[in-house]
Amino acid sequence: MSLLVIGINHTSATVDLREKVAFSPDKLTKALDELKNSDAIKSGVILSTCNRTEIYCEVKLGISSGYVINWLAEFHHVALDLLMPSIYIYEEQAAVKHLMRVSCGLDSLVLGEPQILGQVKKAFADAREHNAVEGVVEKLFQSDFSVAKRVRTETNIGGNAVSVAYAACTLARQIFESLAESTVMLVGAGETIELVAKHLNDAGCKQLIVANRTRERAMILADQFNADVISLPEIPEHLSKADIIISSTASPLPIIGKGMVESALKQRRHQPMLFVDIAVPRDIESEVADLNDVYLYSVDDLKSIIDHNIEQRKIEAIQAEAIVSEESAGFMTWIRSRQAVNSIRQYRENSESIRIELLQKSIQALASGQNAEKVLAELSNKLTNKLIHAPTLAMQQAAKNGEPDKLAVIRTSIGLDN
């Protein structure tokens, strides 16, 4: 058995090279079929994301990592000398540990990010669909998913916001007890606001207002998250309805001023409002923070929160790494015990084959009228000689080669030193 991982990722390779060896859906189907039909690879899974391409496999006896690397280079028509400097290789327990670290987000560009686990699960499902994975590799991935779940349960590695969009939503959850009962106004409709909307939706927010310069872009978000749409000039009219305002536009001048917020507060009878301004330059006048019942956070405030949370994730990662080390060692113990089970089964089958062969000869001898006592004595002698032949030769060879430790193991194995 030889477990192997070969791959490149965001730390070892440039974007250009990662793009060259990425597997599109069509390429993945062809690649998995090639792995399945390979004479050198027993079982394999291909993980391909924007940040990494990795092949997890069990190779047959005598096959080295070079075979898999050559296959990857040839498949993508990439020169081997271009690929090799960026390749990393993990074998046996190191391969097991690497997969577990990847799935737990410990090897990600953003430490602890949860999306990678879904990508690993998809890679495994694809390999299964094409009958490319079985045996040890299949068991490895199943164990890996349990380890990732344990890490998420026993540590808080994914619990601290490390993106601006998620940090903004985390602030909202901290200040307002229930987002399901809060109205959120999103100013802008770009990628960051779309991420904010997704996080808010996941957190249970049901009342969203999207304010944007162009209605068409705002409608895309509105359809996706069941939101109301207004134009930027309509913000003063609707601002009082919002408990939380998160803004990210490309406007060169502030969109929301102190006077506008004062008016909204009066209409709300001074119920608190949270403003999160993640635009550069600012969408919300800094003087808004001077008002009572207003919480105003800028992108710099969020950055300090994110920096703190990254440090917290690093602390949580220490415990996660300990879990991965423990679980990878446990998986290797399972592999060794599996190998022992196979050896025991083969030993029993060989012994049973000898027994049946000699028994049949004895039955034939008895049927031909030979003396029963003589037949039984011959059976017992031959059975004893055949069963002790292999360990006898092994002890003689160990003694001849000056291998006392090996001789001691054999003696213990056959019960001489128990």
Swiss-Prot record:
Signal peptide: none annotated. Keywords: NADP, Oxidoreductase, Porphyrin biosynthesis. Gene3D superfamilies: Glutamyl-tRNA reductase, N-terminal domain, NAD(P)-binding Rossmann-like Domain. The active site is at C50 (nucleophile). GO terms for molecular function: glutamyl-tRNA reductase activity; NADP binding. Transmembrane segments: none annotated. Substrate binds at T49, C50, N51, R52, S108, E113, P114, Q115, Q119. The record marks H98 as: Important for activity. It catalyses: (S)-4-amino-5-oxopentanoate + tRNA(Glu) + NADP(+) = L-glutamyl-tRNA(Glu) + NADPH + H(+). Its EC number is 1.2.1.70. Pathway: Porphyrin-containing compound metabolism; protoporphyrin-IX biosynthesis; 5-aminolevulinate from L-glutamyl-tRNA(Glu): step 1/2. NADP(+) binds at G188, A189, G190, E191, T192, I193. One of its GO terms (biological process) is protoporphyrinogen IX biosynthetic process from glutamate. Homodimer. Possesses an unusual extended V-shaped dimeric structure with each monomer consisting of three distinct domains arranged along a curved 'spinal' alpha-helix. The N-terminal catalytic domain specifically recognizes the glutamate moiety of the substrate. The second domain is the NADPH-binding domain, and the third C-terminal domain is responsible for dimerization. During catalysis, the active site Cys acts as a nucleophile attacking the alpha-carbonyl group of tRNA-bound glutamate with the formation of a thioester intermediate between enzyme and glutamate, and the concomitant release of tRNA(Glu). The thioester intermediate is finally reduced by direct hydride transfer from NADPH, to form the product GSA. Belongs to the glutamyl-tRNA reductase family. Catalyzes the NADPH-dependent reduction of glutamyl-tRNA(Glu) to glutamate 1-semialdehyde (GSA). This is Glutamyl-tRNA reductase. It comes from Aliivibrio salmonicida (strain LFI1238) (Vibrio salmonicida (strain LFI1238)). The lineage of its organism: Bacteria, Pseudomonadati, Pseudomonadota, Gammaproteobacteria, Vibrionales. The gene is hemA.
